[in-house]
Regions:
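Extracellular jelly-roll beta-sandwich "head" domains, especially the C-terminal globular C1q domain
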Residues: 2-188
Length: 188
């Protein structure tokens, strides 16, 4: 039997690529509370903590997209007294970092700033301010600029600026999750 054009096209079709959407969920695998060191009421400078991390492998994915969600609880107790203008301030910087092939990159940062102050406009009376806070801090970020391969993503918090005397300052119950969407090749 000879292979003519009709016979070949009706009996044989070359494999074509099709794409199947896949979605994965990754959860952080090493959550750590950030307990800031305080010396005689003063928060020590330059403290940084990795709150949670996760690993994502996009090497088999076409057009990967990653949606990150991070949540935590920020807690502090601070005071300022014996001044006509007492102030308590907490300034934290949260950073989502990606580490691929040993190269670290900050994808996005968020600032948490809480400032309380009262004042005596006549500057005669010494006032006192005491604050105790426990509130959630949550962020969402989508990453589209993804290089194929295995990368670690981590959420970091840094102490930036503080006013007042503190009993404690901490970021607790950190949770980092990622939804990974992409397409895998399906030959048929």
């Amino acid at each position: 039997m000879s292979c003519d054009a009709y016979y070949c096209s009706s009996r044989y079709s070359p494999k074509r690529k099709s794409w199947k959407k896949v979605i994965h969920l990754e959860c952080g695998h090493d959550p750590q509370d950030a307990i800031f060191e305080i010396d005689d009421g003063v928060v020590k400078e330059y403290q940084s903590f990795i709150l949670d991390r996760l690993t994502v492998d996009t090497s088999e994915l076409h057009k990967p997209l990653i949606k990150f969600e991070f949540s935590s609880l920020i807690q502090f107790e601070g005071e300022d007294e014996e001044t006509y203008e007492p102030e308590v301030e907490v300034d934290l910087l949260f950073k989502l970092e990606r580490v691929c092939n040993g190269v670290k990159e900050c994808l996005r940062s968020w600032r948490y700033l809480k400032e309380f102050d009262v004042e005596d406009p006549e500057e005669r009376d010494n006032l006192e301010l005491e604050i105790e806070i426990s509130e959630p801090f949550t962020v969402i970020f989508c990453d589209k600029n993804i290089c194929p391969g295995c990368c670690e993503y981590r959420m970091v918090v840094e102490g930036k600026d503080f006013e007042g005397e503190f009993e404690f300052l901490r970021v607790v119950k950190p949770v980092l999750t990622a939804l990974i969407q992409g397409y895998v090749s399906c030959d048929y």
